[in-house]
């Protein structure tokens, strides 16, 4: 580990400036080093956050393949069954926003550990819930608990990791979310077929507890985080509004909305197309699409390395272009072309999200937790709003309409990424 170079000193200076209001200034003869790529502490932090990403998304999405089982077990309609996921994601969107404020005054390590453990225990509670409304309450609480991880994880990495290794570390975290998103769907489906949906959800809960224990054991303590307790509403409002004045951050928030909105909308409705003629795939065959999430496991760390080498804007533009290519392939009739298109969209999404989320932490010089929370709020709003609206588009215009909707979003995203590249070029010229 080494002391931060010139490019990282503005972040350390901002944190020191914030802390100076609460702590007297003292000489700093031995500045605390950042986690540098290749060191043992760096890999401990990266692997710990991979476990956190896995646990978060496996706990979140484990119910998705079980919606028909819920309909049969509790005698509810498919729309009512889907509340077991939509209520959780809605609560998560709210919670990540609140967590950005709370995390400024509490230990990031403890907050993430508590959130993961509470979510895993609530998942076990879901597996034994005797009534439908109790299951929904537990899933909503789970979404609120999970909100303590995503924004805080992004802020932790931005504060503790050396800038030259931030892309890879963020990529490993996002790769963990990809593994979790796939495992949460695939494991529950397989276990439910072999035993029951209750055992399937309980299994995910137990795996979540084990992942939390591994996370807690591996994650190095924060050295560059300065807790700020007792901050009033006016402070948080000012800090929140300040994020929109930092050049580039609003564009990254927009990209979070575009990336997740496009990705979820495609995954929500491609199944309807494949169930219909001429494909007539079974639910099990369509479920195999979730294995494409493995593309995200590869894309996230790879895009991080590429961003560290070639620049974030170039990788973002390439990721969005790959998503557009994949979307075009889904308009073709051969099933192999559609499958390849879904893989391209998945790879591009995880690569783009990895780069954009890491970039937020680099640009937010103060209140990193709040900046990360704003990004994730936009991210989950994209999932909720565009994903829901896509259903109306599907009903009226079929897959061509859905592809058109996603295509418009990707054009907006490309415009934002090009604008970011222009901002970075002007900053280098001014320097």
What are these regions (language model features)?
Residues 94-130:
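Conserved MFS/SLC helix-loop-helix module at the cytosolic interface between two early adjacent transmembrane helices
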Residues 122, 133-141, 336-344:
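Paired small-residue
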Residues 313-356:
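C-terminal transmembrane helical hairpin of 12-TM major facilitator-type secondary transporters
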Residues 75, 107, 128-134, 332-333:
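Helix-breaking motifs and short loop linkers at transmembrane-helix boundaries and internal kinks
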Residues 140-176:
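Cytoplasmic helix-loop-helix junction between adjacent transmembrane helices
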Residues 163, 172-219:
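Helix-loop-helix hairpin linking two adjacent transmembrane segments in secondary transporters
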Residues 96-107, 299-311, 394:
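Helix-to-loop junctions at the C-terminal end of transmembrane segments
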Residues 30-38, 220-252:
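Juxtamembrane intracellular "pre-TM" segments in multi-pass secondary transporters
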């Amino acid at each position: 580990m080494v002391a931060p170079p010139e490019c990282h000193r503005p972040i350390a200076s901002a944190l020191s400036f914030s802390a100076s209001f609460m702590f007297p200034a003292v000489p700093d003869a031995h500045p605390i080093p950042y986690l540098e790529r290749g060191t043992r502490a760096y890999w401990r932090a990266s692997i710990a956050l991979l476990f956190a990403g896995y646990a978060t998304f496996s706990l979140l999405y484990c119910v998705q393949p079980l919606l028909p089982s819920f309909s049969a077990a509790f005698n509810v309609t498919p729309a009512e069954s889907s509340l077991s996921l939509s209520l959780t994601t809605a609560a998560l969107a709210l919670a990540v926003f609140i967590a950005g404020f709370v995390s400024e005054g509490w230990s990031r390590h403890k907050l993430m550990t508590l959130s993961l453990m509470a979510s895993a225990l609530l998942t076990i509670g879901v597996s034994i819930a005797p009534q439908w409304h109790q299951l929904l309450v537990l899933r909503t609480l789970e979404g609120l608990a999970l909100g303590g991880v995503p924004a805080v994880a992004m802020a932790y990495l931005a504060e503790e990791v050396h800038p030259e290794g931030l892309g890879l570390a963020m990529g490993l975290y996002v790769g963990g979310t990809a593994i979790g998103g796939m495992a949460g769907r695939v494991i529950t489906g397989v276990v439910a077929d072999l035993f029951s949906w209750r055992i399937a959800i309980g299994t995910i809960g137990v795996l979540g507890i084990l992942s939390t224990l591994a996370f807690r054991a591996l994650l190095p303590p924060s050295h560059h985080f300065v807790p700020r307790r007792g901050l009033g509403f006016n402070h948080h409002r000012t800090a929140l509004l300040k994020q929109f004045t930092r050049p580039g951050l609003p564009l990254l928030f927009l990209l979070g909305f575009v990336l997740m909105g496009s990705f979820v909308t495609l995954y929500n409705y491609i199944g309807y197309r494949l169930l219909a003629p001429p494909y007539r795939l079974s639910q099990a065959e369509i479920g195999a699409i979730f294995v494409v999430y493995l593309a995200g496991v590869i894309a996230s760390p790879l895009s991080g390395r590429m961003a560290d080498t070639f620049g974030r804007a170039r990788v973002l533009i390439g990721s969005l272009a790959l998503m557009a290519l994949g979307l075009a392939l889904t308009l073709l009739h051969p099933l192999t072309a559609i499958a390849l298109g879904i893989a391209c969209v998945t790879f591009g999404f995880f690569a783009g999200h990895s780069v954009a989320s890491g970039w937020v932490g680099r640009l937010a010089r103060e209140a990193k937790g709040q900046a990360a929370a704003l990004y994730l709020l936009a991210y989950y709003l994209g999932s909720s709003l565009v994903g829901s609206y896509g259903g109306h588009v599907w009903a009226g215009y079929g897959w061509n309409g859905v592809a058109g909707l996603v295509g418009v979003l990707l054009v907006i995203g490309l415009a934002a990424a090009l604008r970011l590249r222009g901002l970075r070029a002007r900053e280098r010229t001014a320097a």
